[in-house]
Structures are given as structure tokens and as C-alpha cells.
């Protein structure tokens, strides 16, 4: 075998395996050629299909790279079709992903599955949209979650900087288009025109091409063999022929300069190697060609980086231009320019006026300052636009950083012969990457080897099947052996964006970044983020306020114009310039009123609040993926949390165990004697048990037993050792597996790497939640051995023997085993219970030997593997290990805070009841009235029982992801706002279904993260409390700003309107420039100040708001109205009676001073009211947390300083004059009075205001009872078929009895048996008798549990104190402190605590006998 062309390594024991036979390069003459997808523009597209001489092959693609739908006229051959099924990432009973290879036949044209992409016949299997590119106008492409199928999903609120008319290929000189046109990106050019001089909008709207054309790719691949586009086209469409043309996998590896087993040759600086010392290129096997010596940078230059090009950010100038394009501002700008022109003409084109006063008794010229107002308005507009644009620019930068953080993740690769963890962006073409369950494949690749790898490609291609991956050689063999009419099934292609459902394997990367399948789709889907629910609410409110403000402005303009026309008659002496100036003043004041009334700061406030919140949340290990989730968490009522890693530290360590059955080992036995259940005294001791320290385990186990124990741990594991960021070696993988590997390392047994490399693996059984176990079959000389590890109570049932150790330490070299007996089974059960009650996770390790493979009497399934059920029996138990996962610090306090905030916490865990209840009791989750139940039982409940149990269910043990999803669905149907944590691939549906999904940042799979809204980067439950706090902080910030702005709006509109209409000169007491300054204060400055308050724990002191709660609460409404009325009264009194109150004469100087005083009082009322609006509750301390918010302090000082400068030096620009000490004193007193008035409002009872608002129909009646949705009401009575029939009969009975009975909801007509409206005959009523009896019996028997005999599942008979988790199947537990009169006791036939005559212990330190069981 040539050294330059190493063969792929295929692990198989089947002599007929396709891997052991070479495939001919051409198919047999009698074989039907494999149908191929015709690429638009390629030579093949001009010719006919091999089997379609007329050129009407139904499998051809249309010229625009889209599939012809059946019956479209392009496809004369009938096409098979089936209902399209929405993609599902899970394999539950309700999943759309199934393992089936059923083919369509004329007799069965609708198969259960669609194998479109796999056999290259998309429309023959209803895969019409498999390769259809997403249209950029499709609303779904803008969805923040629904289309998030890959690594680069983005919710940044920026416009699309890419049009992707042609896919980009990274070359040595930069990004270029694949057709070899100019190297610049035409999509970024604005205003480009076609030959007719029109902008090419049509081209911009077309979706990007779904295919690449290698013939137009001018990229020079030297030193590699293949161009980037040619490699990318291997998977789009999947083409085994194209792969064969480049030499198959061996030719591909040779062309890329990579070893199929040891990966790329790199130096030690390319990542964290498994052993810290990857081999150099000189040590690597392979060729000596230039491609073998190419650097990583060279690979990136040719094939690109695994990172999508950054979207073009809007510059500050562009944001300013977009802000200035507001129609109202444009109108105001036009008016300001006209005013400036008239002012300049007045000042420069006309002689100055001569005025006489005390200072100028002989007369002097009036100052030429008419131009100042126009300039001031222009400057004010510029400031408003500039400040708003800077805010948007800063917000965009924050979201950009957030997206960069969110897109960051690690992947496992093989480089230099060692496994290492690198950043996903560092993956290059040629890398050998590892596949693991739950991973979202980040790049395109070709499968090399693996065990039972199945992928869900529905999210990437619409393919609804779970597709198993095979090696290239197996695919070639299948193709060459196809009979006429058969289609290719086996697939070796891996598509980016697909999800690994199960299995482990390796693949070589062939396309990354924008050239990958998913990369091109993600580039096409780029767009602005959707608005959050709160933004939508505020936009509606802002639109309403703007309409009212616009109506006020229009009404003011009409009123002033009427006065203007009247004065044309009554005062004809005015010059034309005066008339024009007066008209412009009317227009300016009306437009300015509209500017002030339009609350453009409302959307800004929520955006700023979200931007600041998400930035600070990221620093606190909360990565927000969907902005709306922040708002939703504010009103969360239930949190369904995992146990492992969320409530506990997820740093598992083996602290106790049982070697065989009798040898109980404990870590640090002298300090932890209570962790051994051996010789615990009379009534608890088990004959033959003995304890020893874990460090002495090698003294009690023979060398053969040590080897067996070590192999059971090391071979049956996917974890490995790696260097962390600090350069220290640690284990990477499942926490349970890493704990066992660390245990083996502490025992100083042979290194796991050596053990794995020496093992010849025949079959692997990956872990699944259904099996609750994982295993591996290895060949040992002429025999085969199965190693299994998993849940102890599950695997113990499958064992019939156990290893034997002796207390005296005498041992030989052989492994001694013995049969199970009744005492042994009881011992194992009590050991499991003992460990579980100490919150230890129990893992059993066992093995079984076979003489041949497959074993006699068994057959391999369709996947060429022996079924698990056929071999997982009659095993020998090696050991049961107790793994400790201590509680995270502060978890109990966090649970208490949730409960204080009105958020119920429910634990959903896969652990047994005893462990789950112990942890829940320590955390404070299991409280009086709480219910404990197992997942299988909860799943079997009727809808009505589930609705009754769900609110009180606190622990759902042994639950599957489907159970968690069902619980979430039930809670949501009851109107709860549900948050859910998840870390596994199968948690995806529950995370999607929940109102807010939390994924684990450390232990979570990529599928879980992709389905989530928020990622807990440190997997801690405490961060869920932080999310609630920040969510309420965002909502509170927006409400604070809303309370402030509406009061300013009302005051400004009333004062301006009344003073302008009452003025003889059509002038408002607040000029246009002054109103623009007020607008700047109430929109931008207030949004920055009030939307940046940090989250505080005081927000947890209240219950969550209802879903239909109004945006403006009664307290807010009360404060808004009182403050607005106070400010209107003060300002209007000063305006109309100020001269008399202050004892001033009526002249121009005093009027100007009075106008400045009114303006100053108005502004300082807003400044002090801004302080007042920092609180929404009835507490009086408005300065709480004031000194912690630097934004508020700085903006408060800017507003005060700016107002002082305006009054003191603003002069003619703001039409004010300097104020004396008395006036400043009046200003500060009037402004500061807002604070005591606010305190008085808070002390005023809310009841009268609430009743008034209800009578005015502004608010809904809070005393009105909530109603169930029609769906929930129907489900309420569908739990028992007998009672459904009773309901039908009661409906009939109500026709005769009527009245009171008819008022009951029980008499609603059943959807199961609708009755006619005709009269019912009396004999029909007799049907009530049997159905009522049946209903009573059915309801009573619904919870009856059959008697369990003594055995492993129930070793103590009916005594629950000594029961394993198996005992609780079909049972319900209540907390011992539950009220004895609780109706659940009677409903489920439970025995209240005191009736048993036993004392009731507290929730803490609960023993297995403290709970009530059925």
C-alpha cells in the first residue's frame, strides 16, 4: 500500500462487509445509472436524462435551481408525494424523525419517510423544498428562532450588508465571486444601475444561488488538488459519482494532504492536545507533496475561514441620515430654514427699528436677532439627530459583541494524532473532526468511520428521516450491487447544520464558512431582528400618543390660522414680511408640538434597556439569544429545572461503592463512616458485608478483577483527557464518565488511552435515555465481551451473577463469581437506596462473555448490529459506584428568592425518586403540599388528572425529555409562563415549547443551545434568578420612562396649546427651541437615565404580572395624572398671573423674564419628576440605588447644567433672559415640590382610582374570575371515557330539569357524542345509571396499584422505606407536612400522616420513609 495514499480504516467483523471489498469504478452494464441532479448552466443541463430521451425527466431541476413540483407540467412522469412533516430534533414517539427505509411503490405511493437528499430524487419523495433556497422576503427568514439551524444565527438589529447574488469563495487575495468576476462584493454597492439606468432591485431581491459552479471558479487551489467550489458541490447535491471522480475518500485525503486517522500535521501551538504533545509533520505518516506541508493559514487563504463574513454595520453618518429622514423632522427643518431666511431678510434687508426706553431715552436701534431662532432650531434638530444616532450606534456595537459571544463554541478534532478541543472558527478544510450525540455539525464533510451515527438533516435540508451514515466504501459497494429500479440508500455525506442524534464517528472537512451548505443558507437568511413583544406594545402605544399629539398640533395650527386670517382684517397695517414671519411662527410652533408629542423615545427606551441588560447579563454568565426572553422572564411563574449541573455542581466524584455485592468501599472512610451501609447494626446489617477505604481497593481486588474493572470503565467511555485553559490536564466529556475515569486514574490502573488502543471494538451501544445505559463489545482472543454501565436499578435487574471479594484480602489471579440469590438481590436494592438517600448517583458496571459474534440465537438488525435486548441479560455485576454531585453554593437561597418572587420551582430529573427527593429537600424545592411523581406515571395520566397534579407537582423523577415537554405543555395550558432548563439533544422540544428556554453552556449540546432563548454559561441555577431580576428590571425601566414621558407629553401639549390660542400674537409661552430642548430631555436623556438602572433584588419582592396586565398600572396612571395636573396649573398660573403675583409691570422686559421663569419651572419640574419616576411601587425612597447608576447621575448633571447655561447665556437663541436669585428660588421650590407630591400620591389609596378606571372601562375588572380557554375546558372532562358519557347524559337531563343544573359547566355538550336538538325520549335517561356507576368505579380504580411481590423492584413488600426507585412506578408521594385534610389524600386513597401514628419530620433531611406513598 502506498504511503502517499493510506486506505481508510473500517472497523468490521463481517466477512461480507462492503468495507472489505473494493468497488469497481463503473457500474455493471445492466445496472440503472444513478440519477443525478442537473446543475443549471452546466453542460449536463442541456442534455437529456439517461432514462428520459425526450428531455422531460421528472428529476431534473428547473433553470433557477428549484425543483419542479409534481403536476407542474414540467414533470410528465407521476411523482410520489407525502405530507411534509415539520422537522424535529428528537426521537420521541411524537417525532417526525423515524428510522425507516420504506420505498414508494405504485401500490404504496405515500411512504412513511422521504429519502430525498439521500437517493438524489428529491421530488420523488416529497422533498420538493430540499434544495430550495429561502426567499429573502419570506417572513420566516426573519424569525429569531424558527430558522436558527446553524452556528451563525444572528439577531443583531442591523440591516443586511450582503445580497449574496453569488456565493463567496475565499482566495489568497480576499473574497471573490465564484464566477471569476471582479474581486469586490457587488452586493455592498448602493445605487448601482442597470443598462436602462434603473437600480437593479430585481437582482437584489433574487435569492442567492443554491449551487456552485466549479467551471467558473477561478481560485487557484495550489498546493491542493481541488477547488473550493468543487469540494462544496459534493454535498449539494450529494454526489457519490463526483466523489469517485476525485479518487474517493483516499483521493480526497491525498489531495487535501491529511491522514485519515491522525488528522492534519500541526505544531503544539494549534490547540490543546490530548497528551499535550501532538506530533510534528515530520513524525506524521503521509506523502511528501506540498499539500502535506501546507500551513493552516494557507488552507484558510484558499478554502476560507469557518466564519461568515461580518455584516456591514451602519456608520454613524448613515444612522444620522436615517434619523433625519423622519418626516416630522424634515418638515420642521424646512420651516426652520424658511424662518432663518425671513430672519436674515428682516435683519439685513430692512432698516432697523428705533426703540425708546429708560436706557435709550433718545432712541436706539433694536438688536438684529431675528435670524437667531432659525439657527437655534436647526442646531436643536442637529443635536436631537446626533444624540439619537449615537445611541443607536452604541446599541448596535453592543449587539454586535453579543452576537460574537453567542457564535463562539468549541469542537473536537484530531490533529497530530491526538484529540484536541479548538474553537469552531479555527476548523479548516482537511481537519478530521469528531461526531458526538447532540452536536450540530458546523461544516460540510465526508464520513470516515464511526458507530451507528444517525443525523437529523431536517433543519438543514427539509429531510425528515434520521439518516444513518456509512463509509464511502460501503456506499460504493451498495451502488454497484443495486438492481434495476432500486435506489441508493447509504450516505457518506455530512451537511453543516445537521444534528447528530446518536452514535460517534469521525469525518473529514470539505467546506467551511460561506462555501458550506449551511453557510450559504445563513447568508441568504440574514436580516434585521424581530421586535420584542414589549417593543410591539410600546410601538402601538407610541402610535396612539402620536396620533393624539398630531391631532393636537393640527388643531392648534387650525386655531392659530383662524386667528391669523382674522388679524389680516383687523390689523391691515402689518407688512408682508411680518405676515410671512407670523405664518412661519404658527407653522413652527404647530410642527414643534407634534415633535414633542410623538414619543419616539418609547422604542428607544426598550431598546436601550435591552441593550444594557443583555450586556450586563453576559458579564453575569447569562447569554441572551432571543431578546424577547428578557421581557418574558419578568413574568415567569414556573421554572422547570434539571438537577445535575444546575442545582448541583456537576463535578462528580466517586465517593463510595460496592465491589461485587459485599465489599463496600468509601473514600476517606475514617471521616465518612456514615457512607457505608455495611454492619450498621441490628436490623440493617447484611451477612457478609464489610467496609474498607477506597484507597485499599487494590488490596481486596485481584489483578484480574482490577483489569476487568478498569476495562469496563475505560473502553466503555467517550470521555478523554485534555488540557484546560490553564494548561492543566483534565477529563472532557460526560461528568459521570469523567468521574469514573478519574477514579480509575486514582487507583493507578493502566492509562485509559492504552486500554482503549489495545481493544478491538466490534460494536458500540451509545447512551440513550430509553436504555439508561451504554455499552461496548470487544474481541478478546477467540471470545467476545460486552461491557455495560448505566442506571444501577435498571442494570441490576439484568444481572444473574456478581463478582466475589473476600474480607481477609486473600485473593488469587482469577475472577471469582457467584449466582444471585434472594439475599443478594435485597442487598443490592438496599445499597442503591442507601446511596440514593445520600444524594449519590448510583452507576452499575457489568459484563457478559460470548463464544461467538453474533451470539448464537441472535441475528443482526438492519444496521448490521446485534439488538441491545438480545445481549443485555444474564450479565455479571462488577460493581455499583456512588457518585457525589454536591449542591452548588447559594442554590437554596436562589430557590427561596424564586418562591418569594412568586415563581414556583419544579425539578425534572432522570435520577431516581430517592436521590431527586433528597436534593429537592436540600434545595427547598420540596415543600408542604408538594407532590412527587415519576415520569412514566405522569405520562399516563389523563388530561384532567394532569391539570390537577401539575400545579402541585414539585419533583418529576425518572423523567424523559418527553415527560418534561408534557409538563411544560400542561402548565402553559393553565396560563403559566414557563421557563425550562435543558442540556440534552432531546430537550429541544421542551425548550422550544417553553416561554423561555435555558440551555446549559457547559454541559449543553449544540441542539439544546440552538433551541434555547438564554444560555446559562456556568450552568448555575442562581443565574435563572438573575434572569428574572433582569427581566423585571427591563420591564420596570420601560415603565419608569413611560410614566415620565407621558406626564411631560400631557403637560407640554396643554401648556403650548392653551397659551398659543390665548395669545394675541399666536405665540406659545414655550418657544419652538425651548420645546426641542424639552423633547431632547424627555426622549433621549430620560431614556438613557431611566433605562439603565441595574437589577436589584427588591424586584423579587412582588409577584409576577399577569399576561394581560396593562402596560400602565393604576399606580402609574395615578402618578402621571397628578404630576401633569400640578405642572399644568403651576405653569399656566405663572404665565397668566405671574406679573401680578410677582408685583411686576407689564412690559417687554418683564414679559421676557416671566417667560424664562415659566420655561425654567417647567424644565425643573421634569428634572425632579425624573427622580420621582425612579420608583413604581409605593415606597417613598426615590433615591434608592441612585449612586450606583452612573448613567443617571451624569445625565442628571447634564440636564441641570444645560438648563442653567440656557437660562444664563441662551439669550436670544432661546428667547430667555437671566434670572435673579428670587426667580431661581421659585424655580427650585416649584420643581422640588414634585417629590413630596409624588410621595403623597404613593400614600393615597389606590382603590378609588382603580374603581374609577374600571367604571371608565380603561381597565378590566380585576375581580372577574379568569376563564379557561375552550381547549382547556374541553380537556378538563376528557380524562375518563365514562365521565365523558356522563356529561352527555347530564346534558340531556338538563333539558328536562333545566335551571340550576343547566348553569353547571358539566352539562356542556360533549365533543365525543353530540346530541340532536330534538326532544329526548325518557328511556334515554336510563343510560345515566350504568355510566354514573361506571364513572365512579373507573375514577376510583384509576389510581389502584396492583400488589407487588417481594423482589428486586420491591424488596420490602409494601414497606416504602426500603423500596428502590422501581417501587414508585405507579405511585404518588405527598410531602409529610401536607395538611391531613388535603383533598389529594381522599382522591388518591392516601393515608394522612397522623393516622399512621408516626411523627412527621421536616422537609430537610427527609428519609425514604417520611413521605406518603401509594
Curated annotation (Swiss-Prot):
Binding of Ca(2+) 1, residues: 595, 600, 1079, 1083
SMART domains the record matches: Cation_ATPase_N
UniProt biased composition (Basic residues): 190-201
GO molecular function: ATP binding; ATP hydrolysis activity; metal ion binding; P-type calcium transporter activity
UniProt note: phenotype after gene disruption: Increases cytosolic free calcium level. Resistance to cadmium. Decreases cell population growth in serum. Sensitive to calcium. Abnormal level of calcineurin-mediated signaling pathway gene RNA, transepithelial migration gene RNA, and antioxidant gene RNA. Decreases VCX1 RNA level and increases ECA1 RNA level during cellular response to calcium. Decreases urease activity. Avirulence in a mouse systemic model of infection; decreases lung fungal burden and abolishes brain fungal burden.
Cited NCBIfam families: ATPase-IIB_Ca, ATPase_P-type
Record protein name field: Calcium-transporting ATPase 2
Originating species: Cryptococcus neoformans var. grubii serotype A (strain H99 / ATCC 208821 / CBS 10515 / FGSC 9487) (Filobasidiella neoformans var. grubii)
Lineage: Eukaryota, Fungi, Dikarya, Basidiomycota, Agaricomycotina
Amino acid at each position: 500500500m502506498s504511503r502517499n495514499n493510506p486506505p481508510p480504516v473500517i472497523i468490521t467483523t463481517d466477512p461480507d462487509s462492503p468495507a472489505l471489498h473494493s468497488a469497481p469504478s463503473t457500474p455493471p452494464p445492466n445496472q440503472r445509472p444513478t440519477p443525478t441532479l442537473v446543475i443549471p448552466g452546466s453542460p449536463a443541463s442541456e442534455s437529456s436524462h439517461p432514462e428520459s430521451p425526450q428531455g422531460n425527466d421528472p428529476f431534473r431541476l428547473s433553470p433557477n435551481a428549484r425543483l419542479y413540483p409534481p403536476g407542474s407540467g414540467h414533470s410528465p412522469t407521476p411523482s410520489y408525494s407525502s405530507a411534509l412533516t415539520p422537522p424535529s430534533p428528537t426521537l420521541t414517539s411524537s417525532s417526525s424523525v423515524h428510522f425507516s427505509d420504506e420505498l414508494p411503490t405504485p401500490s404504496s405511493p405515500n411512504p412513511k419517510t422521504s429519502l430525498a437528499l439521500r437517493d438524489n430524487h428529491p421530488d420523488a419523495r416529497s422533498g420538493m423544498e430540499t434544495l430550495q433556497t429561502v426567499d429573502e422576503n419570506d417572513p420566516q427568514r426573519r424569525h429569531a428562532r424558527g430558522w436558527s439551524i446553524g452556528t451563525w444565527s444572528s439577531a443583531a438589529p442591523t440591516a443586511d450588508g450582503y445580497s449574496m447574488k453569488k456565493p463567496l469563495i475565499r482566495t489568497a487575495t480576499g473574497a471573490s465571486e465564484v464566477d471569476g468576476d471582479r474581486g469586490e462584493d457587488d452586493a455592498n454597492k448602493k445605487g448601482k444601475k442597470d443598462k436602462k439606468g434603473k437600480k437593479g432591485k430585481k437582482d437584489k431581491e433574487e435569492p442567492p444561488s443554491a449551487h456552485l459552479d466549479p467551471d467558473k471558479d477561478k481560485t487557484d487551489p495550489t498546493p491542493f488538488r481541488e477547488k473550493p467550489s468543487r469540494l462544496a458541490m459534493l454535498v449539494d447535491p450529494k454526489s457519490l459519482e463526483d466523489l469517485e471522480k476525485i479518487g474517493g475518500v483516499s483521493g480526497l485525503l491525498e489531495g487535501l494532504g491529511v491522514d485519515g486517522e491522525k488528522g492534519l500535521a500541526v505544531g503544539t501551538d494549534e490547540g490543546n492536545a490530548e497528551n499535550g504533545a501532538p506530533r510534528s509533520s515530520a513524525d506524521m505518516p503521509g506523502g511528501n507533496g506540498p499539500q502535506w506541508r501546507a500551513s493552516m493559514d494557507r488552507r484558510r487563504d484558499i478554502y476560507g475561514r469557518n466564519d461568515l463574513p461580518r455584516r456591514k454595520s451602519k456608520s454613524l453618518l448613515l444612522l444620522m441620515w436615517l434619523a433625519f429622514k423622519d418626516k416630522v423632522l424634515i418638515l420642521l427643518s424646512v420651516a426652520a430654514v424658511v424662518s432663518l431666511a425671513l430672519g436674515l431678510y428682516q435683519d439685513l434687508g430692512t432698516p432697523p427699528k428705533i426703540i425708546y426706553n429708560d436706557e435709550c431715552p433718545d432712541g436706539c436701534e433694536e438688536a438684529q436677532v431675528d435670524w437667531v431662532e432659525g439657527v437655534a432650531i436647526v442646531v436643536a434638530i442637529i443635536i436631537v439627530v446626533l444624540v439619537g444616532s449615537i445611541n443607536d450606534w452604541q446599541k448596535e456595537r453592543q449587539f454586535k459583541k453579543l452576537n460574537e459571544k453567542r457564535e463562539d463554541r468549541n469542537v473536537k478534532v484530531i490533529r497530530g494524532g491526538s484529540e484536541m478541543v479548538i474553537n469552531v472558527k479555527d476548523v479548516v478544510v482537511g481537519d478530521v473532526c469528531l461526531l458526538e450525540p447532540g452536536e450540530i455539525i458546523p461544516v460540510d464533510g465526508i464520513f470516515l468511520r464511526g458507530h451507528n451515527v444517525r443525523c437529523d438533516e431536517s433543519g438543514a435540508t427539509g429531510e425528515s428521516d434520521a439518516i444513518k451514515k456509512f463509509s464511502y466504501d460501503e456506499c460504493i459497494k451498495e451502488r454497484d450491487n443495486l438492481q434495476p429500479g432500486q435506489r441508493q440508500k447509504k450516505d457518506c455525506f455530512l451537511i453543516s447544520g445537521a444534528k447528530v442524534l446518536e452514535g460517534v464517528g469521525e469525518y473529514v472537512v470539505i467546506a467551511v464558512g460561506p462555501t458550506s451548505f449551511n453557510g450559504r443558507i445563513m447568508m441568504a437568511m440574514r436580516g434585521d431582528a424581530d421586535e420584542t413583544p414589549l417593543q410591539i406594545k410600546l410601538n402601538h402605544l407610541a402610535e396612539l400618543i402620536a396620533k393624539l399629539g398630531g391631532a393636537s398640533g393640527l388643531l392648534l395650527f387650525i386655531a392659530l390660522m383662524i386667528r391669523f386670517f382674522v388679524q389680516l382684517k383687523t390689523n391691515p397695517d402689518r407688512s408682508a414680511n411680518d405676515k410671512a414671519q407670523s405664518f412661519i411662527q404658527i407653522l413652527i410652533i404647530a410642527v414643534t408640538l407634534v415633535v414633542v408629542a410623538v414619543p419616539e423615545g418609547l422604542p428607544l427606551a426598550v431598546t436601550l434597556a435591552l441593550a444594557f441588560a443583555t450586556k450586563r447579563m453576559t458579564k453575569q454568565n447569562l447569554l441572551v439569544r432571543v431578546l424577547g426572553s428578557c421581557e418574558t422572564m419578568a413574568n415567569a411563574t414556573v421554572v422547570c429545572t434539571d438537577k445535575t449541573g444546575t442545582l448541583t455542581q456537576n463535578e462528580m466524584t466517586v465517593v463510595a461503592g460496592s465491589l461485587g455485592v459485599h465489599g463496600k468501599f468509601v473514600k476517606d472512610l475514617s471521616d465518612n463512616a456514615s457512607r457505608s451501609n455495611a454492619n450498621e447494626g441490628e436490623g440493617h446489617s447484611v451477612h457478609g458485608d464489610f467496609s474498607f477505604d477506597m484507597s485499599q481497593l487494590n488490596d481486596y481486588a485481584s489483578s484480574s478483577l482490577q483489569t476487568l474493572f478498569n476495562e469496563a470503565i475505560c473502553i466503555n467511555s467517550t470521555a478523554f483527557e485534555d488540557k484546560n485553559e490553564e494548561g492543566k490536564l483534565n477529563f472532557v466529556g460526560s461528568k459521570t464518565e469523567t468521574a469514573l475515569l478519574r477514579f480509575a486514574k486514582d487507583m493507578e490502573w493502566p492509562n485509559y488511552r492504552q486500554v482503549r488502543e489495545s481493544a478491538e471494538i466490534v460494536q458500540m451501544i451509545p447512551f440513550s435515555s430509553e436504555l439508561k445505559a451504554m455499552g461496548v463489545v470487544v474481541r478478546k482472543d477467540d471470545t467476545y465481551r460486552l461491557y455495560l454501565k448505566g442506571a444501577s436499578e435498571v442494570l441490576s435487574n439484568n444481572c444473574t451473577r456478581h463478582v466475589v471479594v473476600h474480607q481477609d484480602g486473600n485473593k488469587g489471579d482469577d475472577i471469582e463469581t457467584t449466582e444471585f440469590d434472594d439475599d443478594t438481590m435485597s442487598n443490592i436494592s438496599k445499597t442503591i437506596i442507601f446511596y440514593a438517600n445520600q444524594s449519590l448517583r448510583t452507576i452499575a458496571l457489568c459484563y457478559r462473555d460470548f463464544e461467538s459474534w453474533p451470539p448464537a440465537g441472535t441475528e443482526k438488525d438492519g444496521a448490521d448490529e446485534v439488538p441491545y435486548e438480545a445481549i443485555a441479560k444474564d450479565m455479571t455485576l462488577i460493581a455499583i459506584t456512588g457518585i457525589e454531585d454536591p449542591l452548588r453554593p447559594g442554590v437554596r437561597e436562589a430557590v427561596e428568592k424564586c418562591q418569594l418572587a412568586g415563581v414556583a420551582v419544579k425539578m425534572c430529573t432522570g435520577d431516581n425518586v430517592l436521590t431527586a427527593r433528597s436534593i429537592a429537600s436540600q434545595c427547598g424545592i420540596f415543600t408542604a403540599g408538594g407532590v412527587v411523581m415519576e415520569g412514566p406515571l405522569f405520562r399516563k395520566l389523563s388530561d384532567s388528572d394532569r391539570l390537577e397534579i401539575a400545579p402541585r407537582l414539585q419533583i418529576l423523577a425518572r423523567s424523559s425529555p418527553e415527560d418534561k415537554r408534557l409538563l411544560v405543555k400542561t402548565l402553559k395550558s393553565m396560563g403559566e409562563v414557563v421557563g425550562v432548563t435543558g442540556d440534552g439533544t432531546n430537550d429541544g422540544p421542551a425548550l422550544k415549547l417553553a416561554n423561555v428556554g435555558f440551555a446549559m453552556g457547559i454541559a449543553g449540546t449544540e441542539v439544546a443551545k440552538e433551541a434555547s432563548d438564554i444560555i446559562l454559561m456556568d450552568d448555575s441555577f442562581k443565574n435563572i434568578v438573575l434572569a428574572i431580576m433582569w427581566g423585571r428590571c427591563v420591564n420596570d425601566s420601560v415603565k419608569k420612562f413611560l410614566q415620565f414621558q407621558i406626564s411631560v407629553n400631557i403637560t407640554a401639549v396643554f401648556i403650548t396649546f392653551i397659551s398659543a390660542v390665548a395669545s394675541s400674537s399666536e405665540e406659545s409661552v414655550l418657544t419652538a427651541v425651548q420645546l426641542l430642548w424639552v423633547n431632547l430631555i424627555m426622549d433621549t436623556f430620560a431614556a438613557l437615565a431611566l433605562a439603565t438602572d441595574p437589577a436589584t433584588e427588591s424586584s423579587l419582592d412582588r409577584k409576577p404580572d399577569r399576561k394581560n396586565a396593562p402596560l400602565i398600572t393604576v399606580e402609574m396612571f395615578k402618578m402621571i395624572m397628578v404630576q401633569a395636573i400640578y405642572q399644568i396649573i403651576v405653569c399656566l398660573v405663572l404665565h397668566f398671573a405671574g406679573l401680578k403675583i410677582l408685583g411686576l409691570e407689564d412690559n417687554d422686559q418683564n414679559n421676557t423674564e416671566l417667560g424664562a421663569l415659566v420655561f425654567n419651572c417647567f424644565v425643573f419640574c421634569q428634572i425632579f419628576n425624573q427622580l420621582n419616576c425612579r420608583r413604581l411601587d409605593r415606597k417613598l425612597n426615590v433615591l434608592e440605588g441612585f449612586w450606583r447608576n452612573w448613567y443617571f447621575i451624569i445625565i442628571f448633571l447634564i440636564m441641570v447644567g444645560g438648563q442653567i447655561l440656557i437660562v444664563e447665556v441662551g439669550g436670544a437663541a432661546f428667547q430667555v433672559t437671566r434670572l435673579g436669585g428670587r426667580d431661581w428660588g421659585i424655580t427650585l421650590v416649584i420643581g422640588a415640590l414634585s417629590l413630596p407630591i409624588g410621595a403623597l400620591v404613593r400614600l393615597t389609596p389606590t382603590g378609588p382610582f382603580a374603581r374609577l378606571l374600571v367604571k371608565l372601562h380603561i381597565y378590566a375588572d380585576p375581580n372577574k374570575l379568569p376563564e379557561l380557554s375552550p381547549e382547556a375546558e374541553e380537556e378538563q372532562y376528557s380524562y375518563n371515557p365514562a365521565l365523558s358519557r356522563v356529561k352527555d347524559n347530564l346534558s340531556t337531563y338538563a333539558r328536562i330539569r333545566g335551571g340550576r343544573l343547566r348553569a353547571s359547566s358539566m352539562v356542556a355538550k360533549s365533543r365525543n357524542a353530540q346530541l340532536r336538538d330534538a326532544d329526548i325520549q325518557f328511556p334515554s335517561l336510563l343510560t345515566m345509571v350504568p355510566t354514573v356507576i361506571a364513572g365512579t368505579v373507573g375514577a376510583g380504580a384509576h389510581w389502584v396499584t396492583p400488589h407487588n411481590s417481594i423482589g428486586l423492584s420491591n424488596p420490602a413488600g409494601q414497606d416504602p422505606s426500603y423500596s428502590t426507585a422501581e417501587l414508585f412506578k405507579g405511585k404518588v408521594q405527598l410531602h409529610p407536612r401536607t395538611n391531613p385534610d388535603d383533598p389529594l389524600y381522599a382522591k388518591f386513597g392516601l393515608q394522612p400522616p397522623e393516622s399512621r401514628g408516626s411523627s412527621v419530620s421536616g422537609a430537610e433531611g427527609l428519609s425514604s420513609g417520611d413521605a406518603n406513598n401509594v
